[in-house]
């Protein structure tokens, strides 16, 4: 399966903000964007005025990178959001937030979304008591996620939990760090999600 192999720190610099792709490093002063907050490359510091299309495209790329989706995957999520009732852009973000890999990350079971995807594929996560190994699986209110018994001693998961304790857990989730399990209480409201994302630009881009 195709995947984005570009260095994660370069991806953050390309978007001009932290996308939190590298776990603990993103919360330290070792994060390159703290020292070089401009696009990578020979002409990275040169300021250019972007067209409306370029602004829309950059926003789409930023969201894709945050959630770790390829173009076809992202477009399929958008199509699903567009078919739902309500505001398409908000539907899009709620679907992305409801992916199993994203929820596992937000609960602290992975230091990054990429790591959460990996532990899911390695059968380290249970959904409602049953093995779940599809990172893109959508979950809903009342669903319970927990670390499988055999994986609770893994150093990477223990490290992820310690990192999660230093950052806030989203209000729509409930986490029991002692037993490594969590509850998806309800779907998030738009006000609960990142204010640095402008999903309306993605809607404008795909509406052309």
Swiss-Prot record:
One example of a Gene Ontology biological process annotation: ribosomal small subunit biogenesis
SUPFAM superfamilies: Alpha-L RNA-binding motif
Function: One of the primary rRNA binding proteins, it binds directly to 16S rRNA where it nucleates assembly of the body of the 30S subunit. With S5 and S12 plays an important role in translational accuracy.
SMART domains found in the cross-reference section: Ribosomal_S4, S4
Domain (S4 RNA-binding): residue spans on this chain: 98-160
NCBIfam families: PRK05327.1, rpsD_bact
Protein's name according to its UniProt entry: Small ribosomal subunit protein uS4
Assembly and interaction partners: Part of the 30S ribosomal subunit. Contacts protein S5. The interaction surface between S4 and S5 is involved in control of translational fidelity.
Family membership: Belongs to the universal ribosomal protein uS4 family.
A GO term, aspect molecular function: structural constituent of ribosome
This protein's encoding gene: rpsD
Pfam family, one: Ribosomal_S4
UniProt xrefs under InterPro entries: Ribosomal_uS4, Ribosomal_uS4_bac-type, Ribosomal_uS4_N, S4_RNA-bd, S4_RNA-bd_sf
Annotated GO CC locations: small ribosomal subunit
Domain of life where this protein originates: Bacteria
Record key words, sorted: Ribonucleoprotein, Ribosomal protein, RNA-binding, rRNA-binding
Disulphide-bridged cysteine pairs: none
């Amino acid at each position: 399966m195709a995947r984005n192999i570009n260095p994660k720190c370069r991806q953050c610099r390309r978007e001009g903000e932290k996308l939190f792709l590298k776990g603990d490093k993103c919360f330290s002063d070792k994060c390159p964007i703290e020292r070089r907050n401009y696009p990578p490359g020979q002409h990275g510091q040169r300021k250019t005025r972007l067209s409306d299309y370029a602004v829309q495209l950059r926003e789409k790329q930023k969201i894709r990178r945050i959630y770790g989706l390829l173009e076809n995957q992202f477009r399929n999520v958008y199509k699903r959001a567009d078919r739902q009732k309500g505001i398409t852009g908000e539907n899009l973000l709620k679907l992305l937030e409801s992916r199993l890999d994203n929820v596992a990350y937000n609960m602290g079971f992975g230091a990054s979304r990429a790591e959460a995807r990996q532990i899911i594929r390695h059968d380290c996560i249970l959904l409602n008591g049953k093995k779940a190994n599809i990172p893109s699986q959508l979950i809903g209110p009342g669903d319970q996620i927990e670390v499988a018994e055999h994986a609770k001693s893994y150093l990477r998961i223990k490290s992820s939990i310690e990192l999660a304790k230093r950052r806030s857990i989203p209000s729509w989730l409930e986490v029991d760090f002692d037993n490594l399990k969590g509850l998806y209480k309800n779907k998030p409201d738009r006000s609960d999600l990142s204010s640095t994302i402008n999903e309306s630009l993605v809607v404008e881009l795909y509406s052309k």
